[in-house]
Amino acid sequence: MSGHSKWHNIQGRKNAQDAKRGKVFQKLSREIYMAAKSGGPDPSGNPTLRMVMDKARAANMPKTNIERAIKKAEGNSDEHYDEITYEGYAPGGVAVLVEALTDNKNRTASDVRVAFTRNGGSLGATGSVAYMFDRKGYIVIDRSTTDADEDQVLLDVMDAGGDDLETSDDAFEIYTDPKQFTAVRDALEKAGYKLANAELTMIPQNTTPVPADKKEQFTHLIDALEDNDDVSNVYTAAADDDE
């Protein structure tokens, strides 16, 4: 099927974050550390670690930084981060999910709440918007890296166990059941595809247009959340401008 490109949005955010590369690497180091600490330092036996390492490489994080975070997890460090999800609404009633890794839950909760309230949003209770999103595996193949056409990619995706294929001018975007994500990713790599992105993500069941007079506030809110050192991911149900 065809549709709006989540990959296009990701690329836009990535370009915007290039100026904040140090902060991005700091967050990725934390994710790598936690993945290695909880599941072991070998990515071949730790799918979560492998996924985060792939994410770090896609962000052009130096290999030495990745190795340092893994070695730290192997050592005697007693650093611990809690995984917390915050839920709320952005200006215009757009649902927002915020995933954080924090060593101080009170600090992070306060910072997230301030970001919402200062930018026209509201932080909600647990369960207030999470039901509006589905956990999915998300894999991207840059069309410039393959000679396969849409029909061939669709066949390979179905053979691999993927759920859905969306096409855009620059990418093939594959969605999977989260439990099948690793198997689908590995099958597509074995089939010779070079993956531009492979991660677990949250997909909104429905999208909400951001009112024109709320777009600036909406952007400021998302920027404030993504700039927070403890925030790993921000997901919204905002509709693209071309939807």
UniProtKB/Swiss-Prot annotation:
Belongs to the TACO1 family. GO terms for cellular component: cytosol. It is found in: Cytoplasm. One of its GO terms (biological process) is regulation of DNA-templated transcription. This is Probable transcriptional regulatory protein LGAS_1276. It comes from the Bacteria. The keyword Cytoplasm applies. GO terms for molecular function: DNA binding. Pfam families: TACO1_YebC_N (PF20772), Transcrip_reg (PF01709). Keywords: Cytoplasm, DNA-binding, Transcription, Transcription regulation. Residues 1-22 are annotated as: Disordered.
